[in-house]
Amino acid sequence: MINQDYAWGQDSRKDFMLSMANLYPQAKPAVDQLPKFGAGQYGTEISALMSQPVDLIHSSLWGGDLQAFILQSAPRGMFKKSQVVLTAADHVLPGLGNKMPDGTIIGARGAYGLMAPPSPLNTWWWNTYSKAYNVYPVQAPYRMAQALMGLKLAVEKAMAANKGKKPSTEIMAASLRGSEWPSPAGKISMALSNGQQAIQDTAIGRTQWNEAKKMVMLEDIQRFNATCVNPPLNIKSEDWLKSGFAGAKCDSAAGNDKKPKK
């Protein structure tokens, strides 16, 4: 494992280990690296990770740190020696291009970018963003778009509740609490923390360079319902993981893509 030594990396490491303890109790952790945020150079960590034969390497690195790690480790054969899982990597695909190793399992902290479910709304969003910025949208633009759509819904509901007059902050908050709305990444539900925390479906996939399109595509996309990957109401995430995902509702209707996402 290699995760950054601050809250995000530490929490990601903990959640991964708790999940593995339930899903694959026979698996044993080996090398565990926690470089500082923004380290940039990972030669020592890569040597440590490759010093032992392991089936899987997990990482929650992101942004420039993730790009640097991939560019430094791929030439040394790390991605061929072990299955690498990058939980938040979709945003580096456009920049890395064919330098992104094939067969890497990646996530996007949601069903974003190449893993977004097909819908007229997503098609409109994808085309509009791509035309404006000359690159397709990844997780951050998707999150901003769905947040603005949620805000639009709350404002409209609050205005109606306040008879067309400018609503107070309290009325705005009440309008958003417990609501649901469509987004390019699928349905967003304010389902946890008394209707004040959103959940949504998520997905993972495997990278594959497409020479004809000159871009990284995703194969074997696996989809998971929001209620399958989030704890039930009033249960802390860590307690839920320790319980073996008690109360998880995993509907097979979420489906798996048999072909690369286009």
List the predicted regions and their residue ranges.
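Extracellular/periplasmic Venus flytrap/periplasmic-binding protein
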Residues: M1-P75, M115-P120, W124
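Surface-exposed patches in mature extracellular/periplasmic domains of secreted proteins
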Residues: M1-Q4, Y136-R143, A161-T169, S189-M190
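Residue-level signal for nonpolar/aromatic packing positions in well-ordered secondary structure
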Residues: F16, I57, F69, T104, ...
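Sec-exported extracytoplasmic/periplasmic mature domains
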Residues: M17-P25, M50-V54, L71-M78, S130-N134, ...
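A structural signal for well-ordered alpha-helical segments within the folded catalytic domains
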Residues: Q67, Y142-K152, E170, A198-I199
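Extracellular/periplasmic periplasmic-binding protein-like sensory domains
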Residues: Q72-Q146, E156-K163, M217-A253
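Short, well-structured alpha-helical segments that form the helix of a local strand-helix-strand
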Residues: K165-A185
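Solvent-exposed, acidic/polar segments of extracytosolic/periplasmic ligand-binding ectodomains
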Residues: E180-K262
